[in-house]
Amino acid sequence: MAKNVVNVVKLQIPAGKATPAPPVGPALGQAGINIMGFTKEFNARTADQAGMIIPVVISVYEDRSFDFVTKTPPAAVLLKKAAGVEKGSGEPNMKKVATVTKDQVKEIAETKMQDLNAADVEAAMRMIEGTARSMGFVVED
């Protein structure tokens, strides 16, 4: 018999740094998840991606067991890392803060491909370029 999912929790947590402290602990506690069990398993699974923010989707079942799926880091995080900046522009149409190349955009699009609803890499690249422009980045050939 299949277990029924009673709750789905979505979080963005730094890789390898999940702790029972807020915001992770309260979100998991409300869902009835074993907080220490989740943090140990998440940290072990994401230890190789240190420094990245990892989105995670946690499915909670009737018997309070859970499983989770880690996604690829958000496009904005990957773009900031590629451009070497801390944050995007507050006024992206006025102030440009960084430049990324088409090759960097293609690399990010290939990384994100499994999580994007794009038919091919070119469509994924257009999505990533749009994110870059909205952050105040210039996309160069």
UniProtKB/Swiss-Prot annotation:
<dbReference type="GO" id="GO:0022625">
    <property type="term" value="C:cytosolic large ribosomal subunit"/>
</dbReference>
<comment type="function">
    <text>Forms part of the ribosomal stalk which helps the ribosome interact with GTP-bound translation factors.</text>
</comment>
<keyword id="KW-0694">RNA-binding</keyword>
<comment type="subunit">
    <text>Part of the ribosomal stalk of the 50S ribosomal subunit. Interacts with L10 and the large rRNA to form the base of the stalk. L10 forms an elongated spine to which L12 dimers bind in a sequential fashion forming a multimeric L10(L12)X complex.</text>
</comment>
<comment type="similarity">
    <text>Belongs to the universal ribosomal protein uL11 family.</text>
</comment>
<dbReference type="InterPro" id="IPR000911">
    <property type="entry name" value="Ribosomal_uL11"/>
</dbReference>
<dbReference type="Pfam" id="PF03946">
    <property type="entry name" value="Ribosomal_L11_N"/>
</dbReference>
<dbReference type="Pfam" id="PF00298">
    <property type="entry name" value="Ribosomal_L11"/>
</dbReference>
<keyword id="KW-0689">Ribosomal protein</keyword>
<dbReference type="InterPro" id="IPR036769">
    <property type="entry name" value="Ribosomal_uL11_C_sf"/>
</dbReference>
<dbReference type="InterPro" id="IPR020784">
    <property type="entry name" value="Ribosomal_uL11_N"/>
</dbReference>
<dbReference type="GO" id="GO:0003735">
    <property type="term" value="F:structural constituent of ribosome"/>
</dbReference>
<dbReference type="InterPro" id="IPR006519">
    <property type="entry name" value="Ribosomal_uL11_bac-typ"/>
</dbReference>
<keyword id="KW-0687">Ribonucleoprotein</keyword>
<keyword id="KW-0699">rRNA-binding</keyword>
<dbReference type="InterPro" id="IPR036796">
    <property type="entry name" value="Ribosomal_uL11_N_sf"/>
</dbReference>
<dbReference type="InterPro" id="IPR020783">
    <property type="entry name" value="Ribosomal_uL11_C"/>
</dbReference>
<keyword id="KW-0488">Methylation</keyword>
<dbReference type="GO" id="GO:0006412">
    <property type="term" value="P:translation"/>
</dbReference>
<dbReference type="InterPro" id="IPR020785">
    <property type="entry name" value="Ribosomal_uL11_CS"/>
</dbReference>
<protein>
    <recommendedName>
        <fullName>Large ribosomal subunit protein uL11</fullName>
    </recommendedName>
</protein>
<dbReference type="GO" id="GO:0070180">
    <property type="term" value="F:large ribosomal subunit rRNA binding"/>
</dbReference>
